[in-house]
Regions:
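RNA-binding accessory domains that recognize and position tRNA/RNA substrates
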Residues: 1-143, 155, 160
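Short, glycine-rich nucleotide/cofactor-binding loops
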Residues: 145-152
Length: 160
């Protein structure tokens, strides 16, 4: 049995437990709470300068989804079969999008570690919170948004 399978059997789930957002002296601080049951509980913190306050509904939605992006890095510790979201919800379409991001975004990780798994079997995403209404942005935007994390892929993305 591979390490991948061993870890998945030993640590079946990754919990996105909670997050908090607070405004402190012209900055927003976001604290995330994660857990891999049987392995560890931990926090991740972000702080963003803020020239002005942001609508709380929008801020919470942004913070929640930033936390979803954070789960990908930490999920790699044990590659659990389930991602359980205890502090928010995703629509079926959003779950499909996040599963695709996990699978495609972890391509190099899986290749380097000899992990062979289908997109469907990599991770299931479960939400325990009730569904909430999606946010609708009425503003129009021009240009492209490129995520730059500092790795080789970021340079390639910018060149394309």
């Amino acid at each position: 049995m591979s390490k991948f399978e061993d870890f998945r059997n030993q640590y079946n789930s990754f919990l996105y437990k909670d997050y908090s957002v607070e405004y402190i002296e012209s900055a927003y601080r976001i604290v995330y709470h994660f857990e891999i049951p049987g392995l560890c509980e931990f926090q991740s913190k972000w702080e963003f300068p803020a020239k002005e306050r942001v609508d709380e509904t929008i801020l919470k939605a942004l913070a929640f989804h930033l936390g979803m992006a954070e789960t990908i890095s930490y999920w790699k510790c044990a590659c659990p079969k389930q991602l359980k979201i205890l502090c928010g919800t995703l629509s079926a379409e959003q779950k499909k999008w996040w599963k695709k991001l996990y699978y495609n975004g972890l391509g190099e990780f899986m290749y380097r570690n000899g992990i062979v798994v289908s997109k469907e079997d990599l991770v299931t995403i479960e939400c325990e919170d009730k569904a909430c209404a999606p946010l609708h942005d009425t503003q129009s935007y021009d240009g492209c948004l490129v995520s730059v994390g500092g790795g080789k892929d970021s340079v390639v993305s910018l060149e394309v």
